């Protein structure tokens, strides 16, 4: 009888993460668990981990050797995702958190918080529909971040990024925790697409291409600076028009290809992990980490703008200038700024109203 009791106790301890429980009901207390995971590294939380972006994002972050502890939070289905990913034989320890009542527990002590939470734009849904839902979600999550891990680097993926990053900034300002260096909108997917599409035109490996993409993260606010491509290359006006249009419309291209069954989830997860990995290397102290991101900026007259930034231990260490633009890029930039300004104001007004 004692042997059976011991076996049951061991099974209960091992399976403790499979379903959400109150701390006083759990056989294995949080204080008994490994504090930083199986390896030395950083503590990362994904808010919206059970969604279309969140699941592949969580899987890829579990594979990152710089992550020691991975917290997965969502309002539904977190136990299943946590159980599945926790079976991967990589160093990071995975813990799941389900529902609003466990949000703060998911955030305490985190070094990096990634926010893919929200709904994707679906056929028939207007931008206002998308904004009204996701704005409230981002507001709630950022209020908890301000309370539980105000020093964390925050990567915002939830669309519309042009508005949700200003929303996050206003929430942090109200809480007295705002540090513009630590708040970054993830525009890496635009860079990834630009590298891929340019490589297709040139007939080269996309890993050998680097295209800076500035402005914002929607439609004409996405401005690839093809004149600054590395390695240096010139394009015909027809090629510039084709590449710019395809990069700006990469999202709708995927939505159309999926025939209403989803949006760009896998490529977004890949891009988000690529950017998160850059942030973690910078937190570790690696030098020369430069990526494009949507941040509080003085590059233009707008309060937020996507451009190349140098990352460091505190987040954004330096915002790099735009560099020389050709006539096409200057004209496109002026168009982008008008739309971007309206999106920024919409986000700020959502909090201040």
Swiss-Prot record:
Pfam families: Ldh_1_C (PF02866), Ldh_1_N (PF00056)
Enzyme class per UniProt: oxidoreductase
Residue range covered by the transit peptide: 1-33
Main location: other
Domain of life: Eukaryota
Binding site for substrate: 121, 127, 159, 193
Keywords: Glyoxylate bypass, Glyoxysome, NAD, Oxidoreductase, Peroxisome, Transit peptide, Tricarboxylic acid cycle
Gene3D superfamilies given in the database record: Lactate dehydrogenase/glycoside hydrolase, family 4, C-terminal, NAD(P)-binding Rossmann-like Domain
GO BP annotation list: glyoxylate cycle; malate metabolic process; tricarboxylic acid cycle
Residues bound to NAD(+): 48-54, 74, 134, 157-159, 268
Family that this chain belongs to: Belongs to the LDH/MDH superfamily. MDH type 1 family.
Subunit structure: Homodimer.
Stored NCBIfam families: MDH_euk_gproteo
UniProt protein name: Malate dehydrogenase, glyoxysomal
Source organism of this protein record: Glycine max (Soybean)
């Amino acid at each position: 009888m004692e042997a059976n009791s011991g076996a049951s106790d061991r099974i209960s301890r091992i399976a403790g993460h499979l379903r959400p429980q109150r701390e006083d009901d759990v056989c294995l207390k949080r204080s008994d668990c490994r504090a930083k995971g199986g390896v030395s590294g950083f503590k990362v939380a994904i808010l919206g981990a059970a969604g279309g972006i969140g699941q592949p994002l969580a899987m890829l972050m579990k594979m990152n050797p710089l992550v020691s502890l991975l917290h997965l939070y969502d309002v539904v289905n977190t136990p299943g995702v946590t159980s599945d990913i926790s079976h991967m034989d990589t160093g990071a320890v995975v813990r799941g958190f389900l529902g609003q009542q466990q949000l703060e527990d998911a955030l305490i002590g985190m070094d990096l918080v990634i926010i893919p939470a929200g709904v994707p734009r679906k056929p028939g849904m207007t931008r206002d529909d998308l904004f009204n839902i996701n704005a409230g979600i981002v507001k709630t999550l950022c209020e908890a971040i301000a309370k539980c891990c105000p020093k964390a680097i925050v990567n915002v993926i939830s669309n519309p990024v042009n508005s949700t990053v200003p929303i996050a900034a206003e929430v942090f300002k109200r809480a007295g925790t705002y540090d513009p260096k630590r708040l970054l909108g993830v525009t890496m997917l635009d860079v990834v697409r630009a590298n891929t599409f340019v490589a297709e035109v040139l007939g080269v490996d996309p890993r050998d291409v680097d295209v800076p993409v500035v402005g914002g993260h929607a439609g004409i606010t996405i401005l690839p600076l093809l004149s600054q491509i590395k390695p240096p290359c010139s394009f015909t006006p027809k090629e510039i028009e084709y590449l710019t249009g395809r990069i700006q419309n990469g999202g709708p291209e995927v939505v159309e290809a999926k025939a209403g069954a989803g949006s760009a989830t896998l490529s977004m997860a890949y891009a988000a992990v690529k950017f998160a990995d850059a942030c973690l290397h910078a937190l570790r102290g690696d030098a020369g980490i430069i990526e494009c991101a949507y941040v509080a900026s003085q590059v233009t007259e707008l309060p937020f703008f996507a451009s190349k930034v140098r990352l460091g231990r505190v987040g954004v260490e330096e915002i790099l200038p735009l560099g020389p633009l050709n006539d096409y890029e200057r004209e496109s930039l002026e168009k982008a700024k008008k739309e971007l300004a309206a999106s920024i104001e919409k986000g700020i007004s959502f909090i201040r109203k």
